[in-house]
Amino acid sequence: NKIEFQKNYGWPKASYGEPYGQKKGQPIFFKEHKKNGFQEPLFAFSKAVGISELIHISNNFSSFWIDNFLISSLWGQSIYRMKFDENFERTIFFEKIYIGQRIRDIKYHNKLNAVLLALEETGEIGIITNK
């Protein structure tokens, strides 16, 4: 979501994800945000993908990726490319890019014009370029 002043997004009481590591007697998540007085998410992964980071990709990276965001994931072992409308009110593009490893971190490197991935299992650095 685009964070707005004095909006309540429900954390930690509301989520479309599933609780894990929950102790007996702890309340479960509210699944309906609006009904419980919380701001609805702009986009939700249902089944959770284990988001590790979200970055805005430089418009210099590719003419096809203008104003795009990349979301790295642990459980999903993928990068998710998203684009929102100009007011950040709806998703207008979504693409899953399968990597095959848990992605611990993702960064855009200006000088290399590349996306760098910290891959968990091998400890390698993945590099995505537009070439």
Regions found by a protein language model. Name each.
Residues 1-92, 111, 124, 128-131:
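Beta-propeller domain segments
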Residues 89-110:
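Conserved blade-ending motifs and adjacent loop-strand segments that build the rim/top face
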